[in-house]
Amino acid sequence: MSFIIKCLDCGHNAPYYPTSTNCPKCNSQWREAEYDYEMIGKTLLPKLAGRGNDLWRYKELLPVRNPNISLSLGEGHTPLIRAVNLGMMLGCPNIFIKDERQGPTASFKDRQAAVTIAALKEAGITELVAASTGNVAISYSAYASRAGMKLWAFVTSLVPSVKMREIALYGSQVIKITGSYDQCKQVAAEFARQRRLYLDMGARTITSIEAMKTIAFEISEQLTNIHGPGENAPWRTPDWYVQAISGGMGPLGVYKGFREMQQMGWVDRIPAFAPIQAEGCAPMVVSWKKGLDKAETISSPKTRIETLATGDPGRSYEFLKKYVDSTNGAFESVSDEDAFRAMHVLAKMEGISAEPAAAVAFAGLFKLIRAGIIKPSDTVVVNCTGHTMPAEPGVLGDNWSRDIKFPSTMETPQEGLLAALTQVAPERFPKIVIVEDTMEARRLIRRILQSQGNFTIMEAENGRAGLELIQRELPDLVVLDLMMPEMDGFAVIEALRANPETAVIPIIVATAKELTPDEKNRLGGHIQALMQKGDFLNDEFLEEVKSLIK
């Protein structure tokens, strides 16, 4: 492959050697690979149909001269999944999830490790050093072991022990640092310097950025397969790209991928970028909102999501700020609690179990949609960067399981078995009846409720059936649509209030229309909350549910 390395500070061009980390002219460590975009742009697209479904299908745009397929673990070409239920909940139907959990070690760092290890192997390098909060060390360990290379993995003491054991399982040497992630990186760098070993430098590592840009290639190729080509180009781009960040390497690479496709004429625009940080360690967000060109640092991160605890982003912020501003994007931060809640919503509504760091991106998505920054008509791609394997302590709370204890006898009496089963019977959970004539709306309300707790949920598709169900089951809460044929919600409410047994059941009314003053008067004093459909993500709805079923 033909490519050169260009310095981002002085513009000097040089050949690529993995061990050469600085510009030979100005000594800058910020450099990137450049290719013959005119030639590749014309010749590569027709070749893709006959190539394998991995990131090496774009090998002409990667800094490995002769890719060794024997080193591959099937990295890249992860699914782009439409988030149907999230889209309904948020009123934004074109949300897609780039499911990086489906890489060889279940995170987007597999791309970084695959390309970097391939380049190092090609250069004859046999040892490397990496600082990590878990995922990158696991990915590097897997690929290094496959390539017969030695990895020295420096991790903070807060990395879950199960991740440390996985790193060690591959044969890597784990060095645990009691300190911050920034301190961990400093120790790793000094170790590599003293031993003259190759050091992964995160966003300053050319192969890392080049690997991440394949996410952009895949997104555009996959969106084109779903929606067809763009208006003025063979491939399509989303309106927004959303990803959680720590040091910012992922979006830096993804932006380069979109920029290169634009240079080659494959796409006609670059999406707006939304990097999301945890509030307890959000130096880029804070600096951007202050209008600063250089990032303020955070010496003591205050987040439980350790994988995002980079307090000093360095120059990554300067580049990301330029990309966010030029695409009319936005930096945003979310609390740990918002991220943990997003984990539940994503798992229970889309069947996707994401690690807390990935959930930060989804919490950011919710926030940007609520603020009106992301519009209902926008096409949005959110990077689900990693799997929550295993589920991290504290995310599920104390009551995530129920225990059944049997007597220590050889045979369990039938009565004992039945008694045990009653401990997990759904009747122990609060009952909620949904009365709604639209199936999609019933399903949406059910999924939102299920994402927030354990409820016994029953449904009725019209007012008369709903009234009978409520009178029979006497639920803890009713969620009621007003506008239904034959017996509408007003008639249901009047019938419930006329019966002493049902008069005390709290009611949340959900309606798609603006009520007239007369209609509001009819409801006065008879319901606990009035919610507009399309605003179900509003915390008010969920808080009302929780308060009414206590």
Task: Give the location of each predicted region.
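Hydrophobic/aromatic residues positioned on beta-strands within the core alpha/beta folds
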Residues: 510-511, 533
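Conserved acidic carboxylate
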Residues: 436
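PLP-dependent amino-acid enzyme catalytic core
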Residues: 1-422
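Receiver (REC) domain active-site loop signature in two-component systems and cognate sites
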Residues: 484
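Helix N-cap/capping motif at the beta->alpha junctions
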Residues: 459-468, 489
